[in-house]
Amino acid sequence: MQNPNVKYLKTPQGDIAVFSLEHNRLWCRRQTSDGRYTPFCIAEGVSAFSLCQYESYTYLLYPTTDGRLILSASSDLMQWEPRPLWHAGDKRWQNTYCFMAPQKDAFHLFYGVSQPQSGNHILEYALFQKGQWQPPYQIDHFLPLPGAPFLGRRLGENHVILYYRSHRSTISAREILLSPFTLGSLSPLIQTGGTCTDFSILEDNQQMHILYLSRNLFRNQVVYRCKQGSAVGRPFVLWESGSACDHCLVYRQQDKIILFWCANSLPMRCICENGTSIGPVERCTFPFPLQSLKGEFIGASDPFASEAIGDRQNNFHPAIFSENTQPLSQPQLYAASAPSQVREEKNDELEELRTLLSQRSEEISAVNAKWKAQVDALQERLAAYEKSEPIENDTP
């Protein structure tokens, strides 16, 4: 899942700036002409942050440890103009994850609210306009995701989309028009019988490419789906393994859609064309971080990715993906030989459950037999004891 404390911004000049929150300090690292990243501390006492670009400005929104909510803007990533949207003393913003969508005359804010009494989480919307906040609007109940509790993307000047977990095993999308505020219907995208441990979504022209990781009883799966219009295509299982999978990522490279993930810390990929034709699994041979993370990627006018992989050991520098790959020598041991339908996946799960149930039944039968033997032995000893005990004579 996305790490909410690291984000990547593609600048108009074409380089990538890295924003990170470390020990309540908000840092920006921008690449210099010699390829190094120069750190610059933007603010201290920060508990969380959000990042976006609008027109010629970059915006940072961050709650502080004393309860303030600050909106800061910059045109060069060096000189920042902080502006308080909420003054000190309100604890609601501490550690609150937000998604923002600024406009010329309004500021739109989406955030999660926890209700300690009930344990519920609510996705809310608030509008800041003409110097004051409008009453918040409750969008939906949701279950926070690991890392970033929910994800938000801007699809246009007046159009955003939210991704969040609407049920225990369902990741859904909801499109929203900002002005006038119009809430779209909920659209389930990912539904798994196991646990969805990570997902990545790329909106590309009229298609939505969905890649996710599913963990079941004894294996991990990498699954791809394509949404075109309102129809979500069938799931394709790209990879199955008993080892751990993480950091799935969808990105566009020229006219190809790349489906990327790590299996047992090894980078893998498939090439997808038109959302239907999927090539073989290949192992990536380019240098890849030993300790990696995934962060939000923002700012490309022609978005080729919505996330990026960074290096924990090298100040979160973005990993550079190249075309260096090699086919797996024995793909049948790891990857699915062909895209399998979700029915096959369910049948495998049922077979595993039947096997597990049979094993447990045998264990229970063995325990029952052991206890029955012990009970029979005790009953025999009790009967023998009663026979050997003399009967008292009540006659005077």
What are these regions (language model features)?
Residues 1-396:
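Extracellular, repeat-based ectodomains that mediate carbohydrate processing or recognition
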